[in-house]
Amino acid sequence: MKISRICLGAMQFGNTAPWMVELEDARKIWKKAWDLGINCIDTANVYSRGRSEEIVGELVKGMREDVVIATKVFGQMGNGPNDRGLSRKHVMRQI
């Protein structure tokens, strides 16, 4: 599979800030990106406390073989010692 030169950033997908968009608007953004040849989405566990990743999952349903998802798992998701970083426990919890 070839990855598009441009990747769609999904930090704006979610609901924790006034500038973010939920699923309906995210679908419009993704459709436009897809129509322009973009097949890569970048997200992270800390984007809207995981909501961005949930939205991305909804967006790529049925087309998973054609899309590249880049995500990050380092971010702090809680107050415990294993709620951030790259420990095996944290990484496995995030995926």
Segments from the language model and where they lie:
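Active-site mouth loops of central-metabolism enzymes
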Residues: Q12-E24, M77-M92
